[in-house]
């Protein structure tokens, strides 16, 4: 709507801007993304343009921070042989409302492109209070059964859906893609994935 919200000097890293204060609710809005490449900014090919997706994300005042989900499987190699893998899921939740909120998270793991009903693991956290204007990282352990490992030959991917609940009501759903894989270094065979 004619306001510059921000600039980003480097094209190979993700970035986002909160445009809430510039949106005219109930009216037509113009959102412009512009590339202005007057001076080369790299020693490599300095072409320019938009070559990845540009997304408009609408969130509830209480939501998972952008790129706010971290998933780790520290014992994957040992646990995968038994069929159940314990995933440590950390989600950073932001409370942009005017009051403290009691937040509960439910993490559900299912094959990418599938439905939540195809879940192979789920966990719900205890309620946690997040003060107005604050953020909190909430930890959970999800027992995942039957996950197929990711490899270059079989790039199996899963979606970890994080549902944010306030007062028992789901106010946001945030998806993170994940592949269950581990790396190995060996003096004779080198690096393997």
Regions found by a protein language model. Name each.
Residues 14-21, 135-143:
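Exposed aromatic-hydrophobic patches
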Residues 36-42, 149, 165-171:
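Short acidic/polar inter-strand loop motif in beta-rich domains
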Residues 1-73, 97, 113:
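Accessory beta-strand-rich segments of carbohydrate-active enzymes
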Residues 82-129, 136-140:
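Beta-strand-rich binding/interaction modules
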Residues 73-85:
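Short, solvent-exposed loop/linker segments at the N-terminal edge
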Residues 33, 107, 160-162:
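Hydrophobic/tyrosine-rich beta-strand signature of extracellular beta-sandwich/beta-rich modules
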Residues 68-69, 75, 161-193:
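N-terminal carbohydrate-binding accessory modules
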Residues 23-28, 42, 100, 144-159:
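Short glycine/proline/serine/threonine-rich loop/turn segments at secondary-structure transition edges
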């Amino acid at each position: 709507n004619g306001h510059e919200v921000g600039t980003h000097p480097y094209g190979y890293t993700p970035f986002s801007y909160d445009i809430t204060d510039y949106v005219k609710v109930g009216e037509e809005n113009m959102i412009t993304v512009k590339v202005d490449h007057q001076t080369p900014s790299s020693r490599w090919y300095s072409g320019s343009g938009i070559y990845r997706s540009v997304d408009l994300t609408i969130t509830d005042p209480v939501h998972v921070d952008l790129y706010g989900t971290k998933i780790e499987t520290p014992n994957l190699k040992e646990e995968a042989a038994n069929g159940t893998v314990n995933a440590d899921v950390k989600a950073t939740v932001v409370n942009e409302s005017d009051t403290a909120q009691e937040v509960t998270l439910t993490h559900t793991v299912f094959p990418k492109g599938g439905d939540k009903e195809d879940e192979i693991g789920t966990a719900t956290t205890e309620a946690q209070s997040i003060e107005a204007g604050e953020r909190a990282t909430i930890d959970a352990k999800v027992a995942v059964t039957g996950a197929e490992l990711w490899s270059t030959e079989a790039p199996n991917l899963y979606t970890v859906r994080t549902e944010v609940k306030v007062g028992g009501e789901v106010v946001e759903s945030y998806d993170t893609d994940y592949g269950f894989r581990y790396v190995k270094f060996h003096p004779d065979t080198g690096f393997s994935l």
